[in-house]
Regions:
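Jelly-roll (double-stranded beta-helix
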Residues: 1-173
């Protein structure tokens, strides 16, 4: 046994992070990495992030070029607008934003949660398994965005996440 590794028989966890109170912080600005393993440039591994925000992404969108985001809200709901349409995600629900998909997040107050990012494969619906129709992963339990579009001629800021770093560009919408 490695003497430098502390082993504990009790459950270990961290307390929730404080939501921002000084100024407006949107979803991307409030994204903080907690842990990770692997390398997004090699397309293998994962990362765990937390998000802490109190403001919507106005005229700002994000693209994750590294991997898929599985978002788990813990406090406050997320109104996510994707290229495929809107998704409203509340605490107790999860959502997936796939690699390369543009999105923006609107919030109605202090919001926090966790994100699992995978770099190698994509999230998929689980197989029904031996329980079949009585399983816990029926297609009817999964929602998807309903197509919606807006016609506007405005300048937007696009934040790209690539190789674990953020890059910003301007785009007319």
């Amino acid at each position: 046994m490695n003497k430098r590794v502390h082993v504990s028989p009790t459950q270990l966890a961290w307390l929730p992070f404080d939501t921002p109170t000084d100024g407006d912080v949107d979803f991307i600005s409030g994204l903080k990495s907690i842990a990770g393993s692997g390398d997004p440039t090699l397309r293998e591994g994962l990362a765990v992030h937390t998000y802490l925000c109190n403001a919507s992404m106005n005229k700002r969108a994000a693209v994750n070029s590294d991997g898929d985001f599985l978002i788990v809200p813990q406090l406050g709901a997320l109104d996510i607008q994707t290229e495929f349409g809107p998704m409203y995600v509340q605490p107790g629900e999860i959502c997936v934003i796939q690699r390369g998909q543009r999105f923006r997040v609107k919030v109605e107050g202090p919001t926090r949660g966790y994100i699992l990012e995978i770099w190698g494969s994509q999230f998929q619906l689980p197989e029904l398994g031996p329980l079949g129709a009585n399983g816990l992963a029926n297609a009817r339990d999964f929602l998807h965005p309903v197509a919606k579009y807006e016609i506007e001629q405005e300048s937007w800021e696009i934040v790209y996440k690539l190789a674990g770093k953020f890059f910003v560009s301007k785009q007319e919408h």
